[in-house]
Amino acid sequence: MFGYAVNLPDKLWKLFTLGEFIEGDNMYADENVIKIKHEVLYEVAKAAFDGNLDEIRDNIPFNIIPGPTPQFRCCIYKEREIIRQRVRLAEGKAPGAVDDGNIIQVISSACEDCPISSYTVTENCQNCLGKACINACKFGAIEAGRHRSHIDPAKCKECGKCAQACPYNAIAHLKRPCKFACPVNAITYNEYGISVIDEAKCIRCGKCIHSCPFGAIGSKTYIVNVIEALKDEGKKVYAMAAPATEGQFGPNITMNSWKKAMSALGFNGFVEVALGGDMTAASEADEWYEAYQAGEKKVTSCCPGFVNMVRRHYPDLADKISTTISPMAAVSRMIKAKDPDAVTVFIGPCIAKKSEVEDQKIEGNADYVLTYSEIRAIMRAKDVELEADDMSYQEGSVYGKRFANSGGVTAAVLESLKEKGIDAECKVCKANGAAECKKALLLMKAGKLPEDFIEGMACEGGCVGGPSSFNDMISTKKFRDDLLSKADDREIRANLKNYHMETFSMHRD
């Protein structure tokens, strides 16, 4: 299919060649979860193209789970209910009856069997005479049992003092994978033990999605919306591929590969969003320098997960967010400045980009966002594949292409300042991942941040490490380095002279 060899585990290679992969699960979950998720997306995409989704929607669970015996759960009825809820997500709906507006949703029927109690007494406990755990607990949550100590979950405050006090390491600290993965403590559980996402706290980063061993968390998709737009002869639909795309699919799948595949799929045009990286870098450079001269501190605005973190958890710092729009929004505005009726579709590894479209309401932004798994399901439904190609298509500089890496935004902004003849000694905190973002924002809130600016990336490694990435970071870096080494050395500001930047604004307001 691709014309080159990729070192992947056998089961992943099988899925890769079949196009059967799903948002990051190729790296984090097992083959069964991967296949089921993609089969749902494929079935919905195919039905949407065929125009019979309403007629066959109820048949999809039976097609995927034919029975008569269950494959993974207690019964085929539960398995089919899970598929039914996945179909709703694929259609852009909440899996259940209640929709809180979050793009990330828990599939309640699939959520089960994870431990609820954070601290648990294990069989290592010999009911010792010292009772250090009981003495350490200030909340009366531990009592001696017949064979071992017992922790009352209703009283436990999860302080961890008991585990620290036990000299025999008999108390284990357990967390649900989804709860442990969430960087902002947005996941709890209801009285039935089902995970619940606090919409007000959730930053839509998507870390919880690939952490669930049952695949019980997913995101709404725009698959049906995009297909309907592609089928409408009166609409011009443009695909926009994220800078993180290069390297995700090997050393020979270039932006030209994507351009040709999207054309075969029916898109009227294709733009690499690395161009938007150049646009954002130039605008951000001007904004940073103005703030630097005024002694003001700023934070970047291109990562929607980071922006959500600032607005939801550090609202006092919301005015520090750069007014410059993201590369995705920049390219979308450029396209719509030429064609006001254009439909723009962003393709990348980011779940939070869906939130940028839904929640931030930036005028002229992308209409729809697709993850790699979602666009591949659409491609599979039309028998379109990515093919190895050359590097003849390039619209962004190397700096714009490296926007997808942690530190890439900073490098591009400083390069843009340099090209403008400005030698500003700006100090930048490059916060790599949600944990570092939280630390940097806490310092800024306390007035103790030594740097002038924060480049915030909610995903470790930057966009290339997003929850919907296809490949692992090590392989992706190797492939990206190889591809980007072949790109030309155009400068950021010189490159932008080839585009009518005066026809649209680079700011939110």
Model features per residue range: what roles?
Residues 121, 152, 198, 241-242, ...:
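A secondary-structure boundary/capping signal
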Residues 130-153, 157, 161-198, 203, ...:
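Iron-sulfur cluster-binding cysteine motifs and their immediate structural context
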Residues 2-86, 90-92, 219-509:
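Iron-sulfur-associated redox domains of electron-transfer enzymes in respiratory
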Residues 128, 157, 173, 203, ...:
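Residue-level recognition of alpha-helix initiation/capping sites
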Residues 96-122, 139-140:
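N-terminal [4Fe-4S]-dependent radical SAM core
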Residues 114-120, 143-148, 189, 207, ...:
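Gly-rich Lys/Arg/Thr-decorated short loops/hinges at beta-loop-alpha junctions or inter-strand turns
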Residues 112-118, 128-134, 159-162, 205-208, ...:
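Cysteine-cluster motifs in flexible loop/terminal segments that predominantly coordinate metals
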